[in-house]
């Protein structure tokens, strides 16, 4: 089925964007710019909390971002710093765009005539296209959607690809729909949204994570209740709602990965995924090695069994027999080596409800796991050992634990955090319950 693919965003919004760009350029011309690295370092040092102890750890950069375009943030659920060096924040009002100083530039609140709503994830690819996982209404002949009075009126999960935000000429380049862009259901009777055993339907599926590769191919995670015969999955050819999906850079469906089990947790599973992470990120580089490995956060609903490991790390290996998806034995093995550090990514029961993952695309290679169940941010080195590098001159090379958090509104606390990002030594957290974007930096990164 070919669904309509809207291509434009309202002209009035473009006028506002153009006006803002001129105004901001004028301010820099009259007042000068404070974006040079030396000045930023001085400001960062002056904005840290002086009462914190002088140990290795993350310190807050004040003030936190609380204002989006046209008003305060309302339950921000994700944050991403793009290749264009803008900060993207998704909340109940849409996607806000801020500069690196936290100054709001504009708000994308409507896409092709509908509100931009129920956002779950945002990310930018190397072409500067922005992906937004959200929901959209549509009418489908022959559908059975139970959310409203008309079964042909459906509320479905989508992933928007929006081009031209950086140049001031935004347009919707593509929309990935569930279930229309799931290749396992094309040209079958399951292509149309339907209702399944127990009253669940395609309206219960949601896209939870979006990640890009260096060549702009796309990984998407999806979750929902239809995953086995017992829960209404009609055949093995029909991809489960809990799935890891692959798309080309142009949005063509490639496959869903059958090697990742959908209905039981394991080291190779897509069991109620909440996010997906690849090992590429800003800033822009002339050449980037193509690494297809990925990590998935697992966060089942309270009615389902908890996974032993809340995060899985998967290696993609090309063999003479084709592509294989293997458990990341290196990071898994780190958990069995207590001499390597005081904690590891693969520790049983470590995470309660991991909601977001981030990767430091620099020489550190740090991995960040945001756990809304513990209101905490966990930090690991690239080998999967909990902690960060010790400061120069330290008597030991063991990573130093730097994870932090706790429930509350304090500078090192969170309330149901949903998104984490990293850019140039700064960690950004979408602190949902506190309606803010918190920022942190390692105290050893201040020169």
Language-model segments: residues:
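Blade-level signature of beta-propeller repeat domains, shared across WD40, Kelch, NHL, RCC1
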Residues: 414-447
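Conserved beta-propeller blade signature
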Residues: 86-88, 129-132, 217-220, 289, ...
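Beta-strand-rich domains and repeat architectures in extracellular enzymes and scaffolds
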Residues: 65-93
């Amino acid at each position: 089925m070919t669904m309509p693919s809207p291509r434009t965003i309202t002209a009035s919004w473009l006028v506002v964007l153009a006006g803002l760009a001129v105004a901001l350029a004028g301010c820099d011309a009259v007042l000068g710019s404070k974006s040079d690295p030396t000045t930023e370092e001085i400001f960062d040092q002056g904005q840290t909390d002086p009462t914190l102890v002088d140990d290795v750890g993350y310190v807050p950069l004040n003030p936190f971002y609380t204002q989006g375009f046209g008003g305060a943030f309302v339950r921000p659920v994700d944050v991403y710093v793009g290749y264009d060096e803008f900060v993207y924040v998704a909340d109940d009002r849409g996607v806000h765009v801020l500069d690196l100083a936290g100054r709001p530039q504009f708000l994308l609140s409507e896409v092709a005539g509908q509100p931009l709503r129920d956002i779950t994830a945002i990310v930018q690819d190397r072409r500067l296209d922005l992906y937004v996982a959200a929901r959209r209404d549509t009418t489908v002949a022959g559908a059975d959607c139970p959310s409203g009075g008309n079964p042909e009126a459906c509320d479905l999960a989508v992933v928007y690809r929006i081009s031209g935000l950086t140049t001031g000429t935004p347009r919707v380049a593509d929309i990935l729909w569930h279930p229309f862009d799931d290749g396992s259901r094309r040209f079958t009777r399951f292509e149309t949204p339907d209702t399944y055993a127990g009253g669940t339907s395609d309206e219960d599926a949601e896209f939870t994570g979006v990640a890009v590769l260096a060549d702009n191919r796309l990984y998407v995670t999806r979750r929902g209740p239809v995953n086995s015969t017992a829960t209404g999955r009609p055949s093995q050819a029909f991809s489960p709602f809990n799935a890891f999906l692959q798309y080309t850079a142009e949005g063509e469906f490639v496959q869903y990965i059958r090697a990742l089990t959908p209905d039981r947790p394991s080291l190779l599973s897509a069991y109620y995924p909440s996010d997906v992470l690849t090992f590429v990120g800003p800033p822009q580089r002339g050449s980037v090695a193509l690494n297809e490995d990925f990590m998935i956060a697992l966060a089942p609903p309270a009615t389902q069994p908890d996974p032993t490991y809340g995060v899985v790390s998967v290696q993609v290996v090309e063999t003479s027999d084709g592509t294989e998806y293997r458990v990341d034995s290196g990071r898994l093995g780190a958990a069995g080596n207590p001499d390597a550090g005081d904690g590891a990514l693969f520790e049983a029961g470590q995470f309660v409800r991991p909601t977001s993952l981030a990767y430091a695309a620099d020489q550190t290679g740090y991995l960040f796991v945001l756990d809304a169940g513990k209101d905490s941010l966990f930090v690991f080195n690239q080998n999967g050992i909990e902690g960060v590098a010790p400061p120069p001159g330290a008597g030991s090379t063991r990573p130093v634990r730097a994870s932090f958090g706790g429930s509350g509104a304090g500078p090192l606390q969170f309330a149901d955090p949903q998104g984490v990002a990293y850019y140039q030594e700064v960690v950004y957290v979408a602190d949902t319950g506190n309606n803010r974007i918190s920022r942190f930096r390692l105290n050893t990164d201040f020169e």
